[in-house]
């Protein structure tokens, strides 16, 4: 990440210098308003863009692979807790900051807190639907709940403090409202070999699509889409299909616990990214998310 940031900053400074030279003798020089392009609308550096593309394609699949193996080794709660970390929103937010600037990324992060609330509605809807429906019906109802909640929240104008409070209170309430499904969830059962590659492919493709959409849909919807339940929609139906409704609910419990770390990450990005810069801001946010998730997972497992 430090290499990408340094490479990007050097390229942007070269672009500003080139734009200034070109504007000499012109009455209305074209401003450099987006760090992704020079004043002559050329990309800043093809090598930097290629490097960002490769990181987009491989970072999230690697994290999905790690969380899936953790679920098999330590159970669905731990696996879900790891999946609840900002594995999608973190890398996607970083790439948005690199492509569109820190101000755009910080504003999108503020909207992401409301998107996290919509993701909690997804989790709660899936957990209760799993008692009556299979994975397909539960996924459809959960997606409907997310989209409806996201649409309503996009119409709400609230400050950052209120959004932070909502991103903490809603996951806590959802944890208490999860259904208790009797039975066992043996995650050690053999799974078809094609499932993990499919999960990894879907995750990498989703990050690529989200970052490319950011410049089209604007800051608010970019922030909401950063918390789109991509990993939840991959891990939870697979757990439901393979190990039953109880495994799906336990995975969701871990996901909700991981949302506190995601909220911490997003809050730090929204408040500290512009003054600290990309490298320091994202490093501090990642550390804060990890420590918060460890603390919450310890408390959740202790109560169980």
Model-derived features: where do they sit?
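Transmembrane helical segments that form the transport core of multi-pass membrane transport proteins
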Residues: 205-243, 249
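C-terminal ends of transmembrane helices
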Residues: 63-76, 120-134, 176-187, 236-246, ...
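Cytoplasmic-side transmembrane-helix entry/capping segments in multi-pass membrane proteins
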Residues: 78-86, 133-144, 162-167, 188-199, ...
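Hydrophobic alpha-helical transmembrane segments in multi-pass integral membrane proteins
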Residues: 96-97, 151-158, 205-215, 262-278
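Structural signature of hydrophobic alpha-helical transmembrane segments
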Residues: 50-60, 82-83, 101-118, 160-169, ...
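Selected transmembrane alpha-helices and immediately adjacent juxtamembrane segments
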Residues: 181-221
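Cysteine-centered motifs
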Residues: 33-34, 48
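Small-residue-rich transmembrane alpha-helices that serve as helix-helix interface/gating elements
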Residues: 167-170, 229-230, 280-294
């Amino acid at each position: 990440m430090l290499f990408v940031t340094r490479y990007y900053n050097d390229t942007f400074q070269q672009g500003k210098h080139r734009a200034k030279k070109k504007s000499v003798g012109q009455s209305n020089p074209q401003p450099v308003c987006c760090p992704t392009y020079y004043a002559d609308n050329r990309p800043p550096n093809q090598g930097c863009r290629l490097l960002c593309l490769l990181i987009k394609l491989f970072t999230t699949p690697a994290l999905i692979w790690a969380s899936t193996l953790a679920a098999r080794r330590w159970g669905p709660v731990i696996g879900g807790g790891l999946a609840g970390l900002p594995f999608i929103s973190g890398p996607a937010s970083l790439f948005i900051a690199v492509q569109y600037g820190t101000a755009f990324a910080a504003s999108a992060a503020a909207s992401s807190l409301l998107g996290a609330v919509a993701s909690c509605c997804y989790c709660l809807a899936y957990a209760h639907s799993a008692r009556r429906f299979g994975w397909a019906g539960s996924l459809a109802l959960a997606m409907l709940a997310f989209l409806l909640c996201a649409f309503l929240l996009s119409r709400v104008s609230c400050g950052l403090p209120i959004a932070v409070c909502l991103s903490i209170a809603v996951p806590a309430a959802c944890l208490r409202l999860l259904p208790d499904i009797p039975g066992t969830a043996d995650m050690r059962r053999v799974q078809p070999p094609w499932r993990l590659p499919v999960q990894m492919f879907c995750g990498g493709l989703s990050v690529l699509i989200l970052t490319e959409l950011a410049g089209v849909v604007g800051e608010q919807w970019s922030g909401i889409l950063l918390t789109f339940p991509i990993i939840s929609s991959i891990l939870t139906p697979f757990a439901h299909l393979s190990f039953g409704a109880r495994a799906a609910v336990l995975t969701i419990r871990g996901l909700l616990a991981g949302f506190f770390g995601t909220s911490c990450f997003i809050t730090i990005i929204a408040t500290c990214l512009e003054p600290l810069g990309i490298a320091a801001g994202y490093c501090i946010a990642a550390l804060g998310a990890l420590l918060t998730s460890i603390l919450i997972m310890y408390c959740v497992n202790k109560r169980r």
